[in-house]
Regions:
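Hydrophobic alpha-helical segments within soluble ligand-binding/sensing domains
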Residues: 56-58, 149-190, 290-310
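An alpha-beta-alpha
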Residues: 63, 81, 167-213, 311, ...
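Beta-alpha junction/loop-to-helix N-cap segments that form part of ligand/metal-binding clefts
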Residues: 98-156, 250-274
Length: 345
């Protein structure tokens, strides 16, 4: 058999090593002992790490979920969160709780989730997040559908929470939504801003909308509600006073959007809304974020915390990239209002 240069090199290297072993000095016993100890320490460390990984892989985590109210955006956030953990192969038991829009119920549920010894709690919407954060400073809390966690006193800063809270923000492209309004309704003169005065996120977005409307030279009026029972009356009071309604990602309005749409559409008042679920419920249009992806992002944060040892105190609040915002128009509503949307496609 013909021997290649590479094979010859290997053989010569083996012979040389053997000759050096036979003719060289005897190994230093102390050095040998040190090498053995180092090898044993390394082996022990690797075994400990492997055991830890095996334990984490085999563990079933308890996760409590507190959702403020049932409506499409928050439901999708919840679904995305659960999907991310399942996709990562993390074994979880979810304790799903819904406060049905009752902030006092949020407090009761928050206490229960903490006392049940959950490994992590996922809070959807600001009141739910504030309730849980007020009960524990040790259990990791991930939040979502919260516009500005820092402004809501949930974290020290959105860049560095410095506490047991992090998560994802649903800050919407308010300016772009006002731009969309102008594109669809170029003759709009006065806008009615509809939101719940008790929701900090809604107040923040309303202020952002006012800035955008001021820049555009469009007048506006505030129309606020403090309970769902007021929605129909407040929307009816807009008739004859506004050309268009703008409502941000407001949980109370989202849950009652069918009522808003019923009154607004009957009176030929277009509604530009904060998210897709509100369009499905009868709103005219939005340029908004994908709440499923928002929840999925929070789920990925949970995976990092539970299985990778990520420190929630240094985990910045996550934001969806603007490129993931999507235009959605309710064609049936546009037809009912007699609005041409062909230019949007």
């Amino acid at each position: 058999m013909k021997m290649t240069k590479k094979m010859m090199g290997l053989v010569l290297a083996g012979v040389l090593a053997a000759s050096m072993t036979g003719c060289g000095k005897k190994a230093d016993p102390a050095a040998t002992a040190t090498a053995v100890e180092t090898t044993e320490e390394t082996k022990a460390a690797e075994e400990t790490k492997a055991a830890g990984e095996t334990e984490a892989a085999g563990k079933t985590y308890k996760i409590g979920v507190l959702q403020l109210v049932q409506h499409t955006a928050l439901d999708k956030t919840n679904e995305g969160f659960v999907a991310a953990l399942k996709d990562a192969g993390v074994s979880c038991e979810f304790d799903q709780q819904n406060a049905a829009g009752d902030q006092s119920a949020c407090q009761t549920i928050a206490n229960t989730l903490v006392n049940n010894g959950n490994d992590l709690i996922f809070a959807i919407a600001t009141p739910a997040a504030q309730a849980v954060a007020g009960v524990t400073d040790s259990i990791p809390i991930l939040v979502s559908a919260v516009t500005d966690p820092a402004a809501s006193d949930l974290v020290d800063s959105n860049e560095a929470p410095n506490c047991n809270v992090s998560g994802t923000s649903d800050l919407t492209p308010v300016k772009e939504q006002i731009d969309l309004m102008q594109k669809i309704l170029p003759d709009v003169k006065t806008v009615g801003l509809l939101y719940c005065s008790a929701e900090a996120n809604s107040v923040l977005q309303a202020e952002m909308a006012k800035e955008a409307l001021d820049t555009a030279g469009i007048a506006y009026k505030d129309y606020t509600v403090s309970s769902s029972n007021e929605i129909q009356t407040v929307v009816e009071s807009m008739v004859g006073n506004v050309d268009c309604i703008y409502t941000p990602t407001d949980n109370m309005i989202a849950a009652g959007m069918t009522t808003v749409a019923m009154v607004a559409n009957e009176n030929k008042i277009p509604t530009i809304v904060g998210e897709e679920g509100m369009v499905d419920a009868g709103g005219l249009a939005t340029y908004g974020i994908d709440y499923y992806q928002l929840g999925y992002m929070a789920g990925e944060q949970a995976v990092a915390i539970l299985t990778e040892g990520a420190d929630i105190k240094t985990m910045p609040i996550g934001y969806l990239d603007a490129s993931k915002c999507t235009l959605k128009v309710n064609e049936e509503t546009a037809k009912e209002l007699g609005i041409d949307i062909s230019g949007l496609k």
